[in-house]
């Protein structure tokens, strides 16, 4: 949006125009050379005249923005490069999300942490540029924001556990699982919240669903963290009081790493690799 004007997918139409605009917005801190933009848009595809193709694409983008938004010069040309006009302020939801997470992480005030992480989680609507994940720069940003989202969710869930806000854990985990259905810990949080809410039948159903999801998507059999949750379900079935949620969560961490080689097909390997990238990004590796 710009003032009262909206530039949506219908007006842009071309995927390449959308990618060009998003690249200019997300990299607006510096001028982008023709080579940088060409590599970002076409990667290793052979383009006869990348400078000419980029010039044509930029012309189309400027024409659309001028027609539907404003005569302002959003993108300027300088010495063989293109740059976003810094006089035009930009606010991206992704960057607002990042700011919330950073404020929460930097604070020691529980109320501030809760408020900012809750705002961040509410703002996150899914993978960043999910239709452009065939481009390395989009994948990098998407992985970065998604890892930040998972960290926000799990930190928030741990705070809710300490505050005994089990219904909030249930709502939070349901929302998070819509964004990432193959994260085992998210399934554990959800099932543990159902256990504390004495929703045994639903918890058992969700356990079975979670095991099947992880098996189908990743080829993982008998996931260790979910097995600990299953023990609590069995206790409930026998009429035994469930263990404290804090203890269940602590025990989800495996004592020993699995040893040996794991064989899987390429689709499973690709998904595991993607998850490892997310994990390493969270850990700053």
What are these regions (language model features)?
Residues 264-284:
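Short regulatory alpha-helical coupling segments
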Residues 245-266:
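Amphipathic HAMP/coiled-coil signal-transducing linker helices
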Residues 105-128, 144-240:
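An N-terminal, helix-rich hydrophobic module
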Residues 1-171:
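Intrinsically disordered, low-complexity protein-interaction/activation regions
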Residues 97, 250-251, 284-285:
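Active-site-flanking beta-strand signature of metal-NTP-handling nucleotidyl enzymes
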């Amino acid at each position: 949006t710009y003032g009262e004007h909206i530039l949506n997918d219908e007006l842009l139409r071309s995927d390449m125009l959308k990618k060009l605009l998003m690249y200019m917005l997300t990299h607006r801190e510096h001028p982008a050379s023709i080579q940088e933009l060409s590599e970002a848009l076409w990667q290793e595809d052979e383009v006869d005249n990348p400078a000419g193709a980029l010039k044509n694409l930029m012309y189309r983008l400027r024409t659309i923005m001028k027609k539907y938004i404003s005569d302002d010069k959003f993108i300027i040309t300088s010495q063989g490069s293109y740059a976003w006009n810094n006089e035009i302020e930009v606010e991206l939801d992704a960057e607002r999300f990042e700011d919330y997470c950073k404020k929460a992480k930097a604070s020691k005030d529980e109320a501030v942490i809760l408020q900012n992480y809750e705002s961040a989680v509410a703002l996150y609507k899914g993978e960043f540029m999910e239709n452009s994940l065939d481009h390395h720069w989009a994948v990098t940003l998407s992985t970065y924001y998604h890892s930040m989202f998972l960290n926000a969710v799990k930190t928030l869930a741990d705070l809710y556990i300490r505050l005994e806000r089990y219904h909030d854990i249930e709502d939070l985990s349901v929302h998070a699982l819509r964004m990432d259905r193959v994260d085992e810990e998210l399934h554990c949080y959800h099932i543990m919240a159902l256990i504390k809410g004495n929703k045994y039948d639903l918890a058992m159903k969700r356990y079975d669903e979670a095991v099947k999801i992880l098996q189908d998507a990743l080829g993982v059999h008998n996931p260790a963290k979910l097995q600990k949750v299953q023990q609590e379900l069995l206790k409930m079935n026998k009429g035994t009081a469930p263990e404290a949620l804090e203890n269940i969560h602590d025990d989800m961490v495996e004592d020993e790493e699995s040893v040996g080689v794991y064989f899987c097909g390429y689709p499973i390997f690709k998904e595991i690799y993607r998850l490892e990238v997310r994990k390493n990004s969270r850990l700053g590796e």
